[in-house]
A protein has these predicted regions:
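An N-terminally biased module of ancient metal coordination in phosphate/nucleic-acid-related enzymes
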Residues: 1-77, 113-114, 177-181
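Short, acidic/polar
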Residues: 2-10, 77-85, 152-160
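General structural signal for secondary-structure boundaries
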Residues: 3, 40-43, 47, 83-85, ...
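Acidic (Asp/Glu)-rich catalytic clusters
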Residues: 13, 54-62, 83-91, 161-165
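Short aromatic-enriched loop/helix-cap "lid" or pocket-rim segments at secondary-structure transitions
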Residues: 32-33, 81-82, 105-108
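Short, electropositive alpha-helical surface patch
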Residues: 41, 78-92, 183
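Domain-core and long-helix interface of multi-subunit machines
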Residues: 88-90, 94-183
Length: 183
């Protein structure tokens, strides 16, 4: 991954006029307890401060470069209030699907937050719930098979499009292709 500063320097050098930040938004502990694939809730203020510093740098390096603060927001059943809270202040919400199935107790707290260490994981190996693009754990593919993963992915993707979150844009409608031959 790269920092905001690195991205601004590269964008300025390439003559870009607009750059949108879309790091992965905070997730519930039931989906990613250690916070490995996201900006954790505890890191959101530092993340925003780093973005604001990048805006200042962009104004020095390339005054015509406009930066937009955003997040890639995973959609999962019941996520709306959490996504709205965690993405507050974002100018862009990029909707995405990476998780299929029941996300578990999403209201038990944000990943990495104190007191969430004992929140049960929702992606148990025998379940049909979990990440579809995590190559270290392909249990969803093995348990459901390629066709069912695709079917559920399309259903979830369409649900995200119809969500009251009103995403600005939806990402990778073809994400299952990444592992379609693995399941």
């Amino acid at each position: 991954t790269s920092s905001f500063e690195e991205n601004v320097r590269a964008a300025a050098a390439a003559g870009c006029e607009i750059m949108v930040s879309t790091d992965h938004l905070t997730l519930p502990a039931s989906m990613d307890a250690p916070g490995d694939v996201q900006v954790t809730a505890a890191d959101l203020p530092l993340h925003r401060a780093a973005f604001d510093d990048a805006v200042k740098l962009a104004s020095e390096l390339s005054p015509s470069l406009k930066l937009l603060y955003g997040f890639e927001c995973d959609w999962y059943p019941g996520c709306e209030a959490l996504v709205e809270a965690w993405s507050a202040g974002a100018a862009v919400r990029l909707g995405s699907i990476h998780w299929l199935g029941n996300p578990g107790d999403i209201m038990a707290g944000a990943a990495g937050a104190a007191g969430t260490e004992s929140v049960p994981r929702a992606d148990l190996p025998e379940s049909d719930a979990g990440w579809i693009d995590y190559d270290a754990d392909l249990h969803v593919w093995k348990n459901l098979g390629v066709h069912e993963v695709w079917r559920r992915y399309v259903d979830a993707w369409c649900s995200a499009c119809e969500s009251p979150l009103d995403f600005d844009v939806m990402a990778h409608p073809d994400l299952p292709m990444r592992f379609a031959n693995e399941g």
